[in-house]
Amino acid sequence: FQAEDGIRDVERSRGLGDVYKRQIEIKSNFKTVPGLTVILIGEDPASKIYVKNKEKFSKEIGIDSKVIRYPENIEEKVVLETIIELNQNKIVSGILVQLPLPKHINKQKVIETILPEKDVDGFHPINVGNLSSGYDSKIPCTPQGCFLLLKEVEKNLSGKHAVVIGRSNLNGKPMAQLLLKENCTVTITHSKTKDLKSECNRADIIIAAVGKPQLVKGDWVKKNAIVIDVGINKTAKGIVGDVDFKEVSKIAKAITPVPGGVGPMTIACLLSNTVECFKSCLLYTSDAADEGLGVDLGGRRI
């Protein structure tokens, strides 16, 4: 976070540090470590960098991380078959299919093939439903990371007016759910919102996750607002976010830079979810054995 008192490296101290402690406890108690398998399809530069960072931080804290790489033209059925095999593999605690996918592969079908217990991204419909219903759930990593960063700056979010720019299933909607659970008044904006600037001007918290370079300007933000920039946009001047950092940083109480703001926290939350998936899989297999249940080809109970 870039705040009035300078940069605080919360993503490493509070994010990875906490995951490391839990991973050490698991290794001590179960004589094994959580396993994360990532499926990477194609040669998208941003995806390759992101996956490389996941591998690096996994190794740092002792999570067993593997990457399965496929070319851009891989058949959808091969990807689905791989996921089914990973569902049945007891060594694999968490499964992640790196997005975006090639157009010929059905994203929703891929997401729904992953066991909810192994869904580290929190995208499976069961996890989405649990989150929206207020039940325990795997929470999508980027919104979860944004939420934890928010709590570093503002412990009590109750009654705050939050504007979420973007309504995607991956970021905008789950972010809104997390804010609602904290008793924020939440406004979700999108491409059809008539006066986005005025909506932002009223906000105590702005979450920008729409993919438009430097959309949010300084005169959109009120004094001492908290601004979280999820956007990653490639421009002639380099990588920029959805927020004009130079302008907004002069006004906001706290703002995340791009790159280097939300990204590291997203990875920390991914690894945290991997640890939680390890625990879920232990409960799942234990319950299934107790009840005399088997599994189908997708790894689900029958």
Question: What would you call each of these model-derived segments?
Answer:
Residues F1-Y20, Y284-I302:
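Single conserved hydrophobic/aromatic residue that forms the stacking wall/gate
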Residues G42, K66-E76, S191-T193:
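Short beta->alpha junction loops
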Residues A46-E55, P140-V216, W220:
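Glycine-rich phosphate/diphosphate-binding loop of Rossmann-like nucleotide-binding domains
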Residues S58-E72, V186:
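Short beta-strand elements in bilobed, periplasmic/extracellular small-molecule ligand-binding domains
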Residues V78-N89:
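Short, well-structured alpha-helical segments in soluble
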Residues V97-L157, M175:
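Anion-binding alpha/beta catalytic cores of soluble intermediary-metabolism enzymes, centered on
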Residues I188-S280:
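Rossmann-like adenosine-cofactor binding region
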